[in-house]
Amino acid sequence: MSEVLDDKPEVLVQKLDALPTDPGVYKFLDDEESVLYVGKAKNLRNRVRTYFQQSRQRDGRIEVMVQKAVDVDIIVTDTEAEALILENNQIKELQPRYNVNLRDDKTYPYICIKNERFPRVFKTRTVKQDGSEYFGPYADVSKMNSMMDAIRSVFQLRTCSLDLTEEKIEAGKYDVCLQHHIDNCKAPCVGKQSEADYMETIEQVKKLLNGQTQELMDLLKDEMQRQSDAHNFEEAARLRDQVKALKDYSQQQKVVSQDFADRDVFALHVERDEDIGCGVLFQVREGKMIGKRHKFLRSVEERSDAELILSLVENYYAEANFYPEEVLLSHDPNDHPAQDTHALEELLRQEQGHQVPIKVPQRGEKASLVRMATSNAKLQVGEWKTQQMKRERNRIPESIKALGEALNMEAPPRRVDGIDVSHHGGKETVASCVVFTDATPRKSDYRTYKIRSTEEGTPDDYKAMREVVRRRYRRMVEEDGPWPDLVVIDGGKGQLSSAVEMLKEVGAFDRFPVIGLAKRLEEVYRPGDSDPVFLAKDSPALQLLQKVRDEAHRFAVTYQRKRRKKKTLQSELLDIHGIGPKTAKKLLGEFGSAAKVKEADEEALAEVVGPAKAETITDYYDETEAPAPAETE
């Protein structure tokens, strides 16, 4: 561990030595005190110290995080389950860069049981930390509306926002409203219903929201029988109607499990090439599917499926208000060497009062459920990609669309390479390749090439074009991209033919279209066409081609001039006896120019090239500046 900590501040090393062995949450900080990563641990000392062990294998994301970390903060908790919940809250609040990015469901609606006397039950899209209970979120709004309809038809609950304090009710501040007269509310506002009786109804609502429909129907049937035995036939009839409404609601739900168990089914589908994943949850209550929800996951390229599924499940149960008898997963979280399910198991055990099995089924009805959830996750990713493609298409500039249409291309050329050759009378021949994405220069992908195949002093644009095209696209073939959608050659038929020859030779000709743009009349040449294409001078397509061509020309000329200037500077230093190309390059790298070398004192020169060569340089400039001897008559 010491080797990893060599470059770390002493305060971090001391903290690692003093970490407690309790469960808790740890936060790694960078040199600006920004939180890089939040994690939980059963044993803080052991867990945090593993990040700095030389032998520990880490993915690239965590490796970078550890390199940036200069401090660690900890929060000790009583149990590992508490650490899990705290970790979840900290990640949501701080959004650390190196944690798994779970996109939030804040836009989906919830059903809220308000934290107040005689609680209201209503739909909301805003979750407040006010002690209220929230059920959801509901990705399918129609299912939520069906649930609310069932609640209204089964239970007599208030819908008003009156402040029903005991004092105001006893003071008679309120009058009954229409909802009481049509038997939708028992009028707690005027004391016709006690708080205890109302809260008993709320407990029944919670059972319905948690999918415990059969249990609730059994309770209502027992109560109906008691009321009937007591000759309270009106109340018994009301309870009978409640049971019927619940039965009608229950029959709308699909049976997906013949053992009628309560279980949650989590599945994951990830497409790392697109850096997108989706987790799906099926909520199965009494064997019936009562809800489905999903979360998209970003920044998944370097995260294992085991890590992602555990983050998904822990994130969910840290905020859940119902815990099932069994949890089914599409991937095993324990496959990741640096994590386990201990905290999750402890949390579920605390909430349920007994061990909750966490399984990855391989066959049978449960495996079928997991496969169905996985198919839904894959479908969600497909829908996301479709929407992403639509958004991408909407962002394509008009000039790109116009160019694709002008060249009869199947799709707009969103990535365009522009190639040009430059020389000075056949000397210092160079080439450039510029890249445009969506009509915008992508300068990080620009490249320059020193041409080696031409004879110094003999101009040969065709040979130079063949060399640059061969070098650039042979490498693309070897690395399989990134491929352009179009290549623009600065020149006419000759330059285009040279480029096509090399593209065929390296096996890249069929990968993308290539055209030549001649300067004289701005004609567009295509391989195999005897006549050029003329685009309207004011067309966005031609203007984009000119922009690419001119940028390639500018970049090539700039590089060629830079090389000439460097050679000119070096040639002055090479006139000094004993100074060769390597020494001249070293001097220019240190001082920037021959003039600066000339101005430097011998001591400064000696630090770069040694005292002997420093003396040679200063002697040379002293001699060249010495005044000519006076003429004698």
From Swiss-Prot:
Q: What is this protein called?
A: UvrABC system protein C
InterPro entries attached to this UniProt entry = GIY-YIG_endonuc, GIY-YIG_endonuc_sf, GIY-YIG_UvrC_Cho, RuvA_2-like, UVR_dom, UVR_dom_sf, UvrABC_protein_C, UvrC
Q: Which PROSITE patterns match?
A: GIY_YIG, UVR, UVRC
Residue ranges constituting the GIY-YIG domain according to the UniProt record: 21-100
Q: Which GO terms describe its molecular function?
A: DNA binding; excinuclease ABC activity
Matching entries from SMART domains are given as:
GIYc
Check the record and name the Gene3D superfamilies matching this protein: 5' to 3' exonuclease, C-terminal subdomain, GIY-YIG endonuclease, UVR domain, UvrC, RNAse H endonuclease domain
Q: What is its main location?
A: cytoplasm
What is the taxonomic lineage of the source species? Bacteria, Pseudomonadati, Rhodothermota, Rhodothermia, Rhodothermales
Example of a GO cellular component annotation carried by this entry: cytoplasm
UniProt key word Membrane: no
Its biological purpose: The UvrABC repair system catalyzes the recognition and processing of DNA lesions. UvrC both incises the 5' and 3' sides of the lesion. The N-terminal half is responsible for the 3' incision and the C-terminal half is responsible for the 5' incision.
**Limits of the UVR domain:** 214-249
**Which family does the UniProt entry place this protein in?**
Belongs to the UvrC family.
GO biological process terms, alphabetically, are:
nucleotide-excision repair; SOS response
- Give UniProt keywords alphabetically: Cytoplasm, DNA damage, DNA excision, DNA repair, Excision nuclease, SOS response
The organism is: Salinibacter ruber (strain DSM 13855 / M31)
